[in-house]
Amino acid sequence: MADVLTVVAKIRAAKGKGDALAALLAEQAEVVRKAEPGCLVYRPHRSTTDPELFLFYEQYRDPAAFDAHRKAPHLARYRERREKEGLTEGTVEVEIYRSLT
């Protein structure tokens, strides 16, 4: 378990685009779950107090699985679509953690 990586990312939808971003995030989560056996958890969340704020909680079996995720063509397509449709504003905040046990 010590090789497990946990990724926490915060994403802010552009004003009025929360529902569209939520739909895209749910779609992306389904693709990742099916395409990436090294991804243990890939779960988007929406804030209960701010409908335009989202958090991703992700876990990968090891650094190689996370690297495969970052290089996956479906991730590139997701980012391209997010940009093209103007779904987000600001910078995506990402923190990566290594399991202690």
Each language-model region and where it sits:
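Glycine-rich beta-strand-turn "strand-cap" elements at beta-sheet edges
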Residues: 1-5, 43-52, 78-101
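An amphipathic, aromatic/His-enriched active-site/gating alpha helix that lines ligand/cofactor pockets
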Residues: 27, 31-40, 59-93
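Short, well-ordered beta-strand segments in beta-rich or mixed alpha/beta enzyme
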Residues: 4-12, 41-71, 95
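N-terminal first-folded block
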Residues: 3-35
